[in-house]
């Protein structure tokens, strides 16, 4: 996003914040639509103590980011196989993609909850598999669009298959993979929260479930704001990495 | 069988399979040879109408593609595995945008299996030879087509190429840059005693810079004439050049029944 667009977005967010404070703190009576800003501020304390926010937050954030980073590096490591046509592993992994087109991926998470005892490891595995498949499908798709002149010139210089995979094809698609990672990052947060919500255990999804059970609107609102803030920070970190280390443009 | 030729193409044919299973021929029994340059390098070109299989032929010579029949010999030895001896420079810029100038050249040295490849101590010399001194840390995507072409040339030199194949290099260049690049290629082939083979659809360009011209017919491509250019009479305005150009056009008209293609 260009800088003026970001400024515009920030101004818009500030406008909504002020609107919320003015309307819901001073003008409108207490209601079930949005909480009073002062009550939300007070609920942070309750979040910390009653909802065990630090532990739950740490559980979700660690699952999301460790899964995302691990999946990225595993996919990068396996990319030479993924690039190969007619390799059994590549074909097998890609065939599983078929299921994800027609069956919403969260259903796989529900099966995991059914099969295994509640444990942070299961959530991590669920997110890792999700991220890994999403990445390899994108890698395979982008690999077929690599500018053939890069490959041909590298081949004529004497480069072997492995070097071409790692230093040409991977590098060529890396900016697009990182762009995809931004979307994937958002999807992982969503899946993690839904998984935890269904599982009714620890994690931010667990807090949402508990807050719903207690009909605690201010806690729901506060956790939503914090989640949004961290998704925004995560997005910004990925974009920073992409701009810093994948500065070239292939378009 | 060892010969005195640097490059020899013997009866090379190429077929492609279409999507409906149809087989179509792109090249038919191509035979051509380029002798070893003694001093000063050699500059040859392949002229043909558009879409006549020039690029396919170049890829076969550089062993990127395999011929359906026939063989390519470099100094009498079959060349079917690319090792940096014959370097192909495609029509579109092919310098890697994720590597800076120096890294692009280092890559060529790293991957080349050619015994004549340069070592890392020669990088500065190569950068200077292609006119990129001071730009070592610059990235190609920030620069012009001419700049990126110089990087491709530098990589070919670093790999120790004996033959550099340049696919329709001047199509995207404006006149001034084109003249600069032509002069640069000529100087480099003289200094490094290399053979340069380039493909073009532009008769004028080929006649003005080549020592030897091969005429490739329309599909299926066949070399139907070889023309030696007398370099002593070469001058853009000269009658000799005009007569060679006319001769080539007539040959194509008679052979391919195409009124004009350039």
Name each model feature, range by range:
Chain B
Residues 62:
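Helix-to-loop junction immediately C-terminal to a conserved catalytic motif
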Residues 70-82:
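Conserved ABC transporter NBD signature motif
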Residues 92, 99-111:
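Q-loop/switch helix immediately C-terminal to the Walker
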Residues 117-135, 187:
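Conserved ABC ATPase "signature" region
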Residues 139-143, 147:
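Conserved ABC ATPase signature
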Residues 153:
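Hydrophobic anchor residue at the start of the ABC signature
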Residues 164-168:
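Catalytic Walker B motif of ABC-type/P-loop ATPase nucleotide-binding domains
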């Amino acid at each position: 996003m260009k800088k003026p667009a970001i400024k515009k977005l920030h101004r818009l967010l500030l406008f909504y914040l002020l609107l919320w404070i003015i309307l819901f703190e001073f003008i409108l009576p207490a209601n079930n639509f949005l909480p009073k800003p002062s009550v939300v501020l007070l609920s942070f304390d309750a979040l910390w103590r009653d909802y065990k926010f630090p532990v739950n937050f740490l559980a979700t954030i660690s699952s999301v980011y460790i899964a995302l980073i691990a999946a990225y590096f595993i996919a990068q490591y396996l990319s030479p196989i993924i690039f190969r046509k007619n390799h059994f592993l590549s074909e097998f992994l890609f065939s599983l993609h078929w299921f994800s087109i027609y069956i919403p991926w969260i259903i796989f998470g529900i099966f995991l909850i059914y099969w295994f005892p509640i444990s942070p490891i299961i959530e991590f595995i669920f997110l890792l598999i999700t991220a890994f498949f999403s990445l390899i499908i994108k890698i395979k798709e982008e690999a077929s669009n690599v500018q053939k002149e890069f490959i041909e010139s590298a081949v004529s210089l004497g480069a072997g298959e492995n070097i071409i995979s790692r230093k040409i094809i991977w590098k060529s698609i890396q900016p697009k993979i990182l762009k995809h990672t931004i979307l994937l990052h958002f999807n992982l947060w969503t899946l993690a929260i839904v998984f935890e919500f269904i599982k009714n255990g620890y994690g931010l999804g667990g807090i949402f479930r508990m807050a719903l059970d207690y009909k605690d609107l201010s806690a729901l609102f506060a956790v939503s704001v914090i989640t949004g803030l961290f998704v925004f920070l995560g997005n910004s970190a990925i974009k920073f990495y992409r701009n810093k280390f994948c500065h070239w443009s292939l378009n | 069988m060892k010969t005195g030729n640097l490059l020899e193409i013997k009866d090379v044919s190429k077929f492609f399979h279409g999507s409906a299973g149809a087989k179509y021929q792109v090249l038919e029994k191509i035979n051509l040879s380029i002798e070893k340059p003694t001093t000063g390098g050699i500059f040859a070109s392949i002229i043909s109408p558009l879409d006549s299989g020039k690029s396919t032929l170049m890829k076969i010579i550089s062993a990127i593609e395999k011929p359906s029949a026939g063989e390519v010999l470099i100094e009498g030895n079959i060349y079917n595995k690319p090792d940096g001896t014959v370097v192909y420079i495609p029509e579109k810029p092919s310098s890697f945008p994720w590597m800076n100038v120096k890294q692009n050249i280092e890559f060529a040295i790293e991957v080349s299996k050619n015994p004549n490849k340069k070592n890392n101590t020669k990088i500065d010399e190569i950068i200077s030879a292609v006119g990129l001194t001071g730009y070592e840390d610059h990235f190609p995507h920030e620069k012009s087509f001419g700049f990126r072409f110089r990087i491709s040339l530098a990589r070919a030199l670093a790999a120790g190429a004996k033959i550099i194949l340049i696919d329709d290099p001047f199509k995207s260049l404006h006149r001034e840059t084109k003249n600069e690049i032509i002069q640069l290629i000529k100087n480099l082939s003289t200094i490094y005693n290399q053979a340069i083979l380039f493909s073009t659809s532009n008769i004028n360009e080929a006649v003005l810079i080549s020592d030897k011209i091969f005429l490739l017919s329309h599909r299926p491509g066949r070399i139907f004439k070889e023309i030696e250019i007398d370099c002593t009479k070469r001058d853009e305005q000269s009658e000799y050049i005009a007569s060679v150009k006319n001769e080539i056009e007539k040959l194509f008209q008679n052979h391919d029944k195409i009124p004009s293609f350039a």
